[in-house]
């Protein structure tokens, strides 16, 4: 954790270290903000092919999710970048998580759009 205010002296704080879930190679970072200031920090953990949802206030791990193969779309792996939106739409009531999928059998990288409701439970 590093303060973003340049007028405050830098003081780094370890939040998570490499572990069974947090394997090396953290790649993407996004913030899901709720209207009350609460929300999640989402971290792409490329070494684990998954995504950590961390509580913004407590900095505690809320959940760790992976996106697996489904009947129509494959899962994700080797994610470099992510983004999240809390914008409500008719299809995605609480927003979306967009992840870059770095490996596919056909050789083409792509993006997956995930319903925030499905990963934030």
What is the predicted role of each segment?
Residues 1-121:
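Sequence/structural signature of beta-propeller domains
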